[in-house]
């Protein structure tokens, strides 16, 4: 199927096609910790952590290993198999990278979780060092298409992000990379992003839907409706194929009663336990959803 043909498919047809491609996939749950908050000089217009916007976000330096382990233990209790260390800012200092490496070692010794990290722009030698200390997967979103990127960020480029993904692939780390939707882009932008992620051979693609945050330039943006969200997920599954994990992440609670439909439309993973600066769904609600999905999808 030609990529452009996907855009013209009826929603039901697209969902059914995506659903057939997820039949052999397992449910993949992950959780993250906001390990360093605020203090970011980048201008990503959707993000609460940019110091350029007055969002009231908490600001703190890199957490200690005991605090991060506590969050990891909570994630493990919720059934997560992966745990991500996420820091604000374009990149970490060498000193901070050394500290994160020690934290990764500590988590691997005290949990059964696979450890992921999202630390901004890193070079190959830095990523290799983290891998040698136990890092399993690196996360770095491309966010949107190259042509639309300057509408959401001007302090770095789309290709800065691509380079980091390539660096992680080159040192044989697994890679998680996705985007944010509902920031003014169209379906052509989404399709182009999906194609680029496929060509980069990433392992996991998080699908984030904009949660407008007061104080950011996008605070008055309207949230995407459920049908457009479902079409986006299904389109990514059809483009990416059967072997890539697609996770619904930020904004998934806005699906309301239709959240399970995202999994029939191609998703096979989600972030549990909240996001960087916002709470997600409650633990009890997520457990009910997970149990229902496992029964319905035989996960």
UniProtKB/Swiss-Prot annotation:
Which InterPro entries does its entry note?
Answer: Aldolase_TIM, BATS_dom, Biotin_synth/BioAB, Biotin_synthase, Elp3/MiaA/NifB-like_rSAM, rSAM
Domain of life where this protein originates: Bacteria
Question: Which protein, by its recorded name, is this?
Answer: Biotin synthase
User: Which Gene3D superfamilies does this entry report, sorted A to Z?
Assistant: Aldolase class I
User: What function does the entry list?
Assistant: Catalyzes the conversion of dethiobiotin (DTB) to biotin by the insertion of a sulfur atom into dethiobiotin via a radical-based mechanism.
Query: Pathway listed for it?
Result: Cofactor biosynthesis; biotin biosynthesis; biotin from 7,8-diaminononanoate: step 2/2
The residues that the entry says bind [4Fe-4S] cluster are 40, 44, 47
NCBIfam families named among the record's database cross-references: bioB
Q: Provide the assembly information.
A: Homodimer.
What gene name does this entry carry? Answer: bioB
For this UniProt record, give its keywords in alphabetical order, as a comma-separated list.
2Fe-2S, 4Fe-4S, Biotin biosynthesis, Iron, Iron-sulfur, Metal-binding, S-adenosyl-L-methionine, Transferase
What HAMAP family does the record tag this protein with? BioB (MF_01694)
Molecular-function annotations in GO: 2 iron, 2 sulfur cluster binding; 4 iron, 4 sulfur cluster binding; biotin synthase activity; iron ion binding
Which residues are [2Fe-2S] cluster-binding? 116, 176, 247
The answer on whether this UniProt entry bears the keyword S-adenosyl-L-methionine reads: yes
Pfam families referenced in this protein's UniProt entry, alphabetically: BATS, Radical_SAM
Similarity-based family: Belongs to the radical SAM superfamily. Biotin synthase family.
Give every Radical SAM core domain span.
Answer: 22-252
Give the cofactors, semicolon-separated.
[4Fe-4S] cluster; [2Fe-2S] cluster
> Which organism's genome codes for this protein?
Thermotoga petrophila (strain ATCC BAA-488 / DSM 13995 / JCM 10881 / RKU-1)
Query: In this UniProt entry, which cysteines form S-S bonds?
Result: none
